[in-house]
A protein has these predicted regions:
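A short, Lys/Arg-rich alpha-helix, primarily the initiator
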Residues: 1-40
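Short amphipathic recognition helices of helix-turn-helix/homeodomain-type DNA-binding modules
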Residues: 1-16, 67-110, 128
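Amphipathic, well-packed alpha-helical segments that form the structural scaffold of globular domains
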Residues: 16-23, 90, 94, 116, ...
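An N-terminal domain-cap segment
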Residues: 26-39, 99-110, 116-117
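Recognition helix of helix-turn-helix/homeodomain-like DNA-binding domains
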Residues: 32-36, 42-43, 49-66, 74-76
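Hydrophobic protein-protein interaction segments
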Residues: 109-127, 132-279
Length: 279
């Protein structure tokens, strides 16, 4: 099982993988001949940030003092980090005191009622560990038969990486896998001592070579909105879009709502599945 701080949320590993994605030309540096590794060299990052090379090396090696906010902001600019990547950098370098070591496992009854009251489109509540905590009938009909699954099986990361039918259910499996790993990376940065999260990462690392490969990239992803396709044994491929909303009164629970374009085959498929759930 991975060590919490060194694998689940390694600042050094994160910095190394991020600088490998930035070329000298991206940041206005002149080419300097053949390079043994892609991306920026350590001394180039140090120069861009205004640090000594020695300090930056110690930062990547985990031997430096806690970096200031000014240093982290400069690193984020030099490495061209997105908002989610910048937030993850801060989580790794400056852990928040008093941050919860666990995520909420229970859904408020009123919030469950909200999910159940969404009649014509799939909706569910999940946490940042990818545990599905509540769902409506259409979500169970389209995505997975959640009522028939044991609680630990209602985890989308397990289903993506350990279910042999995952590539059939998710036509865009590569993107689904990458975004799932990115969500877990973000969660690990926020809560490196979450025992359930550490166990999940260990289980996926042992059971899935694809997960191990993606985990090593240190990719981070914040689930917000976008396209999503499912393949269903009865209605075939269903192309939807999803939107996520932070569940009120929670830190890490998301309401995810999937919608179909009006008049589309996907809308017809959802209508048919809805009829089946009411039959």
């Amino acid at each position: 099982m991975p060590e919490t701080r060194t694998i689940a949320s390694s600042l050094g590993g994160y910095l190394r993988t991020r600088r490998a994605l930035v070329s000298p030309a991206d940041v206005g540096l002149p080419p300097t001949g053949r390079r043994r590794v892609p991306g920026l060299r350590r001394e180039e990052v140090a120069e861009l940030v205004g640090l000594s090379t020695d300090y930056y090396v110690r930062l990547e090696q985990g031997r430096a003092d806690r970096p200031s906010a000014e240093v982290l902001d400069a690193l984020a600019r030099a490495l061209q980090l997105s908002a989610a990547e910048r937030a993850h950098l801060y989580d790794l370098a400056r852990p928040r005191r008093g941050a919860a070591s666990r995520t909420e496992a229970a859904v408020r009854p009123a919030l469950r009622q909200v999910v159940q009251a969404i009649p014509s489109t799939p909706a569910l509540i999940m946490n940042d560990r990818n545990d599905v905590l509540a769902w409506n009938p259409l979500a169970a009909a389209l995505i997975a038969d959640f009522p028939q699954l044991r609680p630990h099986e209602r985890n989308m990361a397990r289903r993506i990486f350990l279910d042999p039918d995952a590539r059939q259910v998710h036509p865009d499996w590569d993107e689904a896998a990458r975004s799932t790993v990115g969500m877990l990376r973000m969660a690990a940065g926020r809560r490196p001592n979450d025992p359930a999260l550490v166990r999940l990462i260990g289980e996926l690392s042992l059971g899935s070579p694809a997960f191990r490969t993606l985990w090593a990239t240190h990719y981070v992803h914040e689930k917000t909105h976008g396209p999503k396709r499912f393949r269903h044994p009865v209605v075939g491929e269903v192309a939807l879009r999803y939107e996520t909303f932070q569940a009120p009164g929670t830190a890490h629970q998301l309401l995810v709502v999937y919608t179909a374009a009006p008049g589309s085959p996907a809308e017809e498929a959802l209508t048919f599945l809805g009829m089946l759930t009411r039959a």
